[in-house]
Amino acid sequence: MGRSFEVRKASMAKTAGAKIKVYSKYGKEIYMCAKNGGGDPDMNLSLKHLIAKAKKDQVPAHVIDKAIDKANGGGGEDYTPARYEGFGPGGTSVIVDCLTDNGNRTFQDVRQCFVKVGAKIGVEGSVSHMFDHQAVFQFKGEDDEIILETLMMEDVDVTDVELEDGVITVFAPHTEFFKTKTALNGAFPDLTIDVEEITFVPQTHTPVAGEDAEKFQKFLDLLDDCDDVQQVYHNGEL
C-alpha cells in the first residue's frame, strides 16, 4: 500500500501541477487580451474566442473572471509577446511563443531548454518560413465539398479543406479566423467545432526516432515547465 500510495500521490501532484500551469497560461493570456482590447467579450472578439477556448480546456470560471477583473482594474503586470525560433533534436524546426515581463530572463530560460538537449536556438526568421500561419477548424463530417463551396460563397479565402476518417479540417490564413468561424456558424448552426485555433502549420514533417525521440520529448517537457512559454510549434513527428 505504501508504494502504490506514493506513486498515486506523485501522479496526482503531476496532474495538479499540469492544471496549474494551464490555468496560469490562460490567465496571463486573457489578462493581456482584456487589457489591450477591453474586458467585454462581446466587444472584444479575440477575448471571446480565448474565453471559449479556456472553458473547453476546463479552466475554471474564477480564473477567467480574475484575469478580466485584473485587466479592468488597470493595474498588474505588463506582459509583452516574445517569439523564439530554433532547431530541436533530430533536425526538427521549433517556434516558441511566450508572454513575458522580463525579456532577458525568458530568453535565457528558453535558451537553456535548447542547450540541455544539444539543440540550437536561432535568430528571428530562421525556421518560421518553414511554417504557414493558419486558422484551423476541425469538426466531424463527411462532405468536404459542401464546406468548401459554402466558405467560398461567403468569400472566405480558404487555403485547403481536408477530409480524413470522418473528420473535416479547414485551413485559412490566420487573418481570416473570425470570418471563417462566422461563416461556418452561420451556414451550419448545429455544427460542433472541436478545434478552432490560430497556429503555425509545418509545411513538411521531420520523423524523429530512437535517442533523438527521447531528447525531443525531454525538450518539449522542459519548454512546458517554463512559466513564460505559452505555445510551442514544431514539425517533429514522433
Swiss-Prot record:
Family: Belongs to the TACO1 family.
Disulfide bonds: none
Alphabetical keyword list: Cytoplasm, DNA-binding, Transcription, Transcription regulation
NCBIfam families: PRK12378.1
GO CC annotations, alphabetized: cytosol
Cellular localisation: Cytoplasm
Protein name: Probable transcriptional regulatory protein VIBHAR_07036
Organism domain of life: Bacteria
Gene3D superfamilies for the chain: 1.10.10.200, 3.30.70.980
Molecular function terms, GO-annotated: DNA binding
